[in-house]
Design a protein with these regions (language model features):
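Ligand-binding loop in jelly-roll beta-barrel domains
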Residues: 99, 147, 155-181
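DNA major-groove recognition helix of helix-turn-helix/homeodomain DNA-binding modules
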Residues: 50-65
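Short, conserved beta-strand element in jelly-roll/cupin
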Residues: 108, 120-136
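Short acidic-glycine-tyrosine-enriched beta hairpin
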Residues: 139-154
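A short, Lys/Arg-rich alpha-helix, primarily the initiator
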Residues: 1-18
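Short alpha-helical DNA-recognition segment
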Residues: 20-38
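A short glycine-rich, His/Asp/Glu-containing loop-to-beta-strand
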Residues: 79-117, 173-178
Length: 181
């Protein structure tokens, strides 16, 4: 996990510098505080999945940009967990720049909820429940999905994933970035 946090730190710093952004500008573009971005860059803080999504959206890079890379061992790049371990995400395939999608395996702890800020404009997400039950909330409406069921939705609005059961929830998320170059 140490290498993953080091990778996150280096990836964020490299991305910010490649864009020529100050920490202040990066904070404005991502919606993540300047202090938090600085702590992540220095390896002093581990971001939540939601924070990492905000950063990826603000920099217009796929989520998997931060959890895959040359500086990681294959086992380490396979999982990214929030500090409180309520949600774990791992890429099933590397980001496909031609097709512009991420395919992720997600696990949500028993009784947990994860709230997601809107992804970039035009982003579409498809979820397939593998095990358990998923409550997917958007604009105050919750949809219930059982194992084997799937749903496609516009991910450019705030949305939430909730596990109502006393056992872990596992689902796959295919995120299609329609406007990404």
């Amino acid at each position: 996990m140490e290498n993953l946090h080091q990778h996150l730190s280096e990836a964020l710093k490299q991305l910010r510098q490649a864009n020529g952004w100050s920490l202040t500008l990066a904070a404005e573009r991502t919606g993540v505080s300047k202090a938090m971005l600085g702590q992540i860059e220095r390896g002093e803080s581990s971001p939540t999945v939601a924070t990492l999504w905000k950063i990826a959206t603000g920099f217009n890079v796929p989520f998997s940009f931060f959890i895959q890379g040359n500086g990681l061992q294959s086992g380490e790049s396979a999982r990214f967990s929030q500090p409180n371990a309520q949600m774990t995400v791992r890429p099933l395939l590397p980001y496909d720049a031609q097709l512009r999608f991420d395919l992720l395996a997600v696990e949500l702890a028993a009784g947990a909820q994860s709230d997601s800020s809107p992804h970039e404009s035009g982003c579409v997400e498809q979820v397939v429940v593998i095990e358990g039950e998923l409550l997917l909330g958007m604009r105050g409406v919750w949809r219930r999905l059982q194992a084997g069921e799937a749903l496609q939705f516009a991910a450019d609005v705030a949305h939430s994933y909730r596990n109502p059961l006393a056992a872990p929830l596992r689902f796959h998320s295919l995120i299609h970035y329609l406007k990404r170059p």
